[in-house]
Amino acid sequence: MIATTLLLALAFGTANPAPPPLKVVTSLTTYGAIAREIVGDRGTVTSIAQGNEDPHFVQPKPSFVAILRDADLFVTTGLDLELWVPPLLDRANNRKVSEGGPGYVTAYTGIALLEVPTSLSRAHGDIHADGNPHIHTDPVNAIIIARNILVGLKRVSPEGADYFTRREQDFEKRLLEATMGTDLVSILTPAVAYKLLATDQLWDFIGKNSYQGAPLMTRLGGWLKAGEVFRGKEMACYHKEWAYFSNRFKIACAEFVEAKPGIPPTPRHVEDVIALMKERRIPALFASNYFDRNQIEQVAAKTGATAVVVAENSGGAPGTDSYFDLVNSWVNGLAAVYRKGAS
């Protein structure tokens, strides 16, 4: 009996202890929502900016420094959206999550950036030198962001690589299904479905091919199916944050209330936007909920359009905590307006 007890004690004493939970910090809540899909129960995820907060202008707080000081992984866009991030990292002095450290993840890596300026001038407003940084508004980009987070997690927690990989692959599959429908992903396989989306060949492919005697187009579902009602149409936008959404769902921002990013619109420009919306009979004004709601509603009222005011980031409005819920709010909000106009 004593020998057995000693053997058990030795066995438990030499077993590898479970690694402590990872502390993941993200600049934006949307990156946090994606990170949670992968981290699962192996860690905690904390976001610095609030979901209904303009990510360009976040007021640094001492508590943010403390969060970053203890972080194992930090996810940020990596462009010039969150100019408040570098000073926080400097003050935190955590080499693990400082730029170049193993726990520093740039969400934009591998994403084809849109609206890269040909010249830089303050006369154009707060333009982004490397391109539009609102990368998460395209679900395909969300897959790339998830893959970047996975790479970072493997660096800081190699013992959890298999666990994180399984969860990331599951997230990808569910996101593809939400984008184009479960049936189509099942027929194509997730790998082919992703490739067709990433190369912008999906519509051409499903328009030319059949499965079991029926056009593949009939198997389309998800957000792309719901967005067919506004595909090829125009909307007005408040700020230049929907470029990737517009590109994926093929709905153009015909004009912007905020013509120059970061600079309040002049009364003359607002009147020009109203005139254009009336002339083209644009039915929707798409805007994030951290902009001036009164101005958004006034422009919409003067044009007969509907103001579709949404959270740009996860958790920025009730019912948008997950990335899936967030995209649902965008697509369903616009689809309701364009369905009404089509009836």
Where are these predicted regions, by residue range?
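Bacterial N-terminal signal peptides
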Residues: M1-G13
